[in-house]
């Protein structure tokens, strides 16, 4: 049975929390998407390229696998909306983590 809980973790406690046995998988939000990259034993191709993790899984051997599903979520949204971006321009406002992900997704289309 899966249970979802909110963990509000102060930055000073992040490493200890990640090493704890209080979780098997996490959805990571701002401000920790970049900070958890260095804690991962393995990264998906997207997480490696973006240096941003929003999904963490603890493997049976205790190592952490990091992925970035934001990229695929944005790509899915564009593709399923019926918008053909070919030959079009896009304006990405902002310079935070989401803008890096959106820019990478747009470059794939």
What is each model feature region?
Residues 1-81:
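Phosphate/diphosphate ligand-binding glycine-rich loop within oxidoreductases
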Residues 65-68, 78, 87-109:
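Glycine-rich adenosine-cofactor-binding loop
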């Amino acid at each position: 049975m899966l249970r979802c809980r909110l963990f509000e973790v102060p930055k000073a406690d992040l490493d200890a929390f990640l090493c704890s046995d209080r979780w098997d998988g996490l959805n990571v939000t701002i401000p920790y998407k970049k900070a958890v990259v260095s804690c991962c034993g393995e990264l998906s191709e997207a997480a490696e390229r973006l240096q941003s993790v929003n999904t963490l899984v603890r493997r049976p051997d205790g190592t952490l696998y990091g992925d970035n599903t934001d990229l695929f979520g944005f790509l899915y949204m564009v593709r399923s909306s019926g918008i053909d971006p070919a030959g079009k321009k896009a304006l990405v406002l902002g310079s935070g983590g989401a803008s890096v992900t959106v820019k990478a997704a747009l470059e794939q289309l």
